[in-house]
Amino acid sequence: MESGSSIDLSPLDLVAAILQGKADASSLLSLTRSTVSDGNGDLLVLLATSAALLVGLVAALVWRRSAAARTAEPPKPLLAKKEAEPEVDDGKRKVTVFFGTQTGTAEGFAKAFAEEAKARYEKAAFRILDLDDYAADDDEYEEKMKEETLAFFFLATYGDGEPTDNAARFYKWFAEGKDTGNFFEKMQYGVFGLGNRQYEHFNKIAKVVDELLAEQGAKRLVPLGLGDDDQCIEDDFTAWRELIWPELDQLLRNEDDVSGASATYTAAIPEYRVVFYDHEDSRIQEKKNANGYANGHASYDIQHPCLANVAVRRELHTPASDRSCTHLEFDVSGLGLHYETGDHVGVYAENCIETVEKAECLLGLSPATIFSLHTDQVDGTPLSGSFLPPPFPSPCSLRTALAKYADLLSSPKKAALVALASYASEPSEAKRLQFLASPSGKDEYSQWIVANQRSLLEVMAEFPSAKPPLGVFFGAIAPRLQPRYYSISSSPKVAPTRIHVTCALVYEPTPTGRIHKGVCSTWMKNAVPQEESSNCSSAPISVRQSNFKLPMDTSLPVIMIGPGTGLAPFRGFLQERLALKDAGFNLGPAVLFFGCRNRKMDFIYENELNEFVEAGVLSDLIVAFSREGPTKEYVQHKMAEKAVDIWNMISQGGYVYVCGDAKGMARDVHRALHTIVQEQGSMDSSKVESYVKNLQMEGRYLRDVW
């Protein structure tokens, strides 16, 4: 915790506190004398006094933010959206393909579907649209959507049943808007969802959109497609896509039109045009400040991150631990990057040098190779027959490209195997790659690649004759390296110029014997902070808004459950409560259930947590140690021991927060909460389910899980 930091509470914050009943006027009047300059103090006293007199009249009108039932809107883009190109009435049936994507997979499927559909149906015009680019506001969504007659939606579900950043505005308008009756009666549609069956809210966004479209008059062409990334989502997409063609044949092809009906479609392998440069040429240099970072702009998003230095890095585990957890602080002073307690930070880390050198060897190229990528021909006409993502900033060296932009450690998709097969000079290797990518090789792919967690580099090493050119490697084989998201473990009330991250090192063996090192966690562990060197580490970062917030009424009870690095957002919560307490706010009770293996090894932030207890911002610290006693003890066991207290806090309007592993811990905690409600509330199982659902709908049961 940053000691001695000033509390960032504005005069309007203080006046609002009176209006919202979180503090009395007398405490705030005394506080203003010590926190506000003489020039503003008298004005604030007048404002505070007036507010106190009016509080009885306006309290019922004060709007209180609901922390759940709203989807946080992503930051506005830096650049104004392009004006939509006017549609030309060429007599063709208009088909719109929408996508909501977080990592690019949904966008890739949308483009692959549209490319094949274009080849099949020459009398139709296909548009591929990012849902965020489709409309500037709710009115435009309403105006344009009601005119769509044939549309397909590719929608990923992210986090705890949330829409992706670029689908957040659309989903908020679509799912939370007023009942519009048969609003979509003109539309025929199909929906394909991308999710992971291990998560509770599997494909929630696609399910909601599919159901609401049908309820509001749209005609479903094919059943909802449920892509499962826990298995082979490409196979799910292929199976769903094959259901569509017979339906589109009836809609988009005349009876006498047999062109393309029986033709076999072969997708083109995406390939950038590559220009190589003499690295000795003084005109071609890598410019560190010209690689897409948005430093200096008023707002940022994950497509426009800002470059932030690492200010502090320290190990949180003791030397007795065989694992590692890093506390890292990004310096955001002067960048104009702001965050709220409970938000997430997206971090673009680099591949470690060992991984990069392995890739250079497999590609057979010098790390000093300077090149640029292009999506057009030399004459400026677009490359046809492919769906290339925008190229990363170039010219750059091969080493830079592999370190910053290429995902080298994930398992390769089947489309990547097809591309590798096309450039394998050894026939047996090409045949094996083609088999793994084929429907008949489905089981072999699932076992040899997915179950064994083989990375792209491992697969390339198994097929050494496959030497794809750089345009194919970056266009069709190596996906773009994605940002890693972390729950911010600080509060801007205490650390306004720092974003704190709490990150456990990913270092584990795979079935093949390879040691998998997490890209971002390894980078953080090895980062050089400003406090050690002026030549410190830095990374592009951005803030993603979250609904994981403390209640607006600070007097309400708070229950926090977060083992391991799940503690991160609660550290920010407790910093926030400390700032509010120092400002005179009335705080309700707060209980933290934390879990780790052993007090002497991995009890992270132990001293800070004890200080929060002593300061009165944490009422009870309850720790489960899973490796100390004869039996393993976890947070859900401690919850059972405190069942009466938990039920009393919930009954008093308390909020329940859970952060951590979605597949294990969060499920166990969810079951424990059901048991507590059933036993302490004397409810049957059906009423328990309804009660917990209502807590979620009211924003009083929130989860930040991964």
Curated annotation (Swiss-Prot):
How does the cofactor attach, per the note?
Binds 1 FAD per monomer.
GO CC annotations, alphabetized: cytosol; endoplasmic reticulum membrane
Which compartments does it reside in?
Answer: Endoplasmic reticulum membrane
The record, for Pfam families, names: FAD_binding_1, Flavodoxin_1, NAD_binding_1
**UniProt-annotated binding residues for FMN:** 101-106, 156-159, 194-203, 229
- Enumerate the cofactors the protein uses: FAD; FMN
Keywords for this protein: Endoplasmic reticulum, FAD, Flavoprotein, FMN, Membrane, NADP, Oxidoreductase, Transmembrane, Transmembrane helix
GO terms, biological process: piperine biosynthetic process
Where are its TM segments located? 43-63
Protein topology in the membrane: Single-pass membrane protein
Sequence positions that bind FAD: R484, Y485, Y486, S487, T502, C503, A504, G518, V519, C520, S521, W706
Instruction: List the catalysed reactions.
Output: 2 oxidized [cytochrome P450] + NADPH = 2 reduced [cytochrome P450] + NADP(+) + H(+)
Q: Where is the FAD-binding FR-type domain?
A: 303-551
Entries under InterPro entries matching the protein: CysJ-like_FAD-binding, FAD-bd_FR_type, Flavdoxin-like, Flavodoxin/NO_synth, Flavoprot_Pyr_Nucl_cyt_Rdtase, Flavoprotein-like_sf, FNR_nucleotide-bd, NADPH_Cyt_P450_Rdtase_alpha
> Which domain of life does the protein's organism represent?
Eukaryota
- Tissue-wise expression: Expressed in immature fruits, young leaves, flowering spadices and roots.
Q: What is its EC number?
A: 1.6.2.4
The entry lists its GO molecular-function terms as: flavin adenine dinucleotide binding; FMN binding; NADP binding; NADPH-hemoprotein reductase activity
- Could you say which residues bind NADP(+) here? R323, T565, S626, R627, K632, E633, Y634, V635, Q636, D668
* Residue ranges occupied by any Flavodoxin-like domain in the UniProt entry: 95-245
Q: In which pathway does this enzyme or protein participate?
A: Aromatic compound metabolism
The entry's family comment says: Belongs to the NADPH--cytochrome P450 reductase family. In the N-terminal section; belongs to the flavodoxin family.
Q: What does this protein do?
A: This enzyme is required for electron transfer from NADP to cytochrome P450 in microsomes. It can also provide electron transfer to heme oxygenase and cytochrome B5.
- Name the HAMAP family on file: NCPR (MF_03212)
The protein here is known as: NADPH--cytochrome P450 reductase
| The organism of origin for this protein | Piper nigrum
UniProt lists the gene as: CPR
